Structure formats: C-alpha cells, structure tokens
Amino acid sequence: EDLPEK
C-alpha cells in the first residue's frame, strides 16, 4: 500500500 508523502 502506497502512502503519499507529506
């Protein structure tokens, strides 16, 4: 699962 960079 890919989480967006914040």
Swiss-Prot record:
Source taxon at top rank: Eukaryota
Annotated keywords: Cell wall, Secreted
Localization, UniProt: Secreted, Cell wall
Predominant localisation class: secreted
GO annotations of cellular component type: extracellular region
Protein name listed in UniProt: 36 kDa cell wall protein
